[in-house]
């Protein structure tokens, strides 16, 4: 789009006016752009990782730059679930219920070693990774991760959301509406990751 100056009272053609004031794009691209730049998070904080997550909201880190500063009080208003901390088996069912109440399309960020893999708590009462019952889109490693890692994960999720083309509504079948969930990138690369035998050292991450 080019910008030009115009004097008051100067007449221009309709075609030139349309070229200056209109933007043409596919509807799917506009919807993906708006979803990417206005993620509405619902935070599910259980332990020390949540303190670092809330620190990312402060003016020092300014999460508002990425359009995800408004934390929703209800899962029905959110499209991003951020799970941070140790998830016990008692909390798995309420967490799954909160996820199911979110409106599609929805995304999940797992924050910290405890949410990713159970952390140091290899015991009967701790869920060994929230991806055992939730489709996680982005993992944030660390114990606890720094606020910069939270912002980096948010940028990664925005890039993923901007490249996805999900339906605008609900697909209606013969008698009931069926929700839509896109295949997760984690699932698409599962075989490749399972075949890896050499891991990068922490300095390269």
Swiss-Prot record:
An annotated GO cellular component: plasma membrane
Signal peptide, first to last residue: none
Co-factor binding details: Binds 1 [4Fe-4S] cluster.
Matching Pfam families: Oxidored_q6
GO annotation (BP), single: electron transport coupled proton transport
InterPro entries (UniProt xref): NADH_UbQ_OxRdtase-like_20kDa, NADH_UQ_OxRdtase_20Kd_su
Catalytic activity line of the entry: a quinone + NADH + 5 H(+)(in) = a quinol + NAD(+) + 4 H(+)(out)
Protein family according to the UniProt entry: Belongs to the complex I 20 kDa subunit family.
Quaternary organization: NDH-1 is composed of 14 different subunits. Subunits NuoB, C, D, E, F, and G constitute the peripheral sector of the complex.
Name under which the protein is recorded: NADH-quinone oxidoreductase subunit B 2
Gene designation per UniProt: nuoB2
């Amino acid at each position: 789009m080019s910008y030009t100056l115009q004097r008051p009272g100067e007449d221009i053609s309709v075609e030139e006016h349309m070229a200056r004031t209109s933007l043409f794009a596919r509807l799917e691209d506009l919807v993906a752009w708006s979803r990417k730049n206005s993620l509405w998070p619902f935070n599910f904080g259980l332990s020390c990782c949540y303190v670092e997550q809330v620190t990312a909201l402060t003016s020092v880190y300014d999460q508002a730059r990425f359009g995800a500063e408004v934390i929703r009080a209800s899962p029905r208003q959110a499209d991003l679930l951020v799970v941070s901390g140790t998830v016990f088996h008692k909390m798995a069912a309420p967490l799954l219920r909160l996820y199911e109440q979110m409106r599609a399309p929805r995304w999940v960020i797992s924050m910290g070693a405890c949410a990713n893999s159970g952390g140091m708590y290899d015991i009967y009462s701790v869920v060994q990774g929230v991806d055992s019952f939730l489709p996680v889109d982005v993992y944030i490693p660390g114990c606890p991760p720094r606020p910069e890692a939270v912002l980096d994960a948010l940028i990664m999720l925005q890039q993923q959301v901007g490249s996805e083309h999900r339906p605008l509504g609900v697909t209606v079948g013969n008698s009931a509406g069926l929700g839509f969930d896109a295949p997760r990138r984690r699932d698409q690369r599962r075989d490749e990751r399972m075949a890896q035998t050499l891991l990068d050292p922490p300095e390269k991450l």
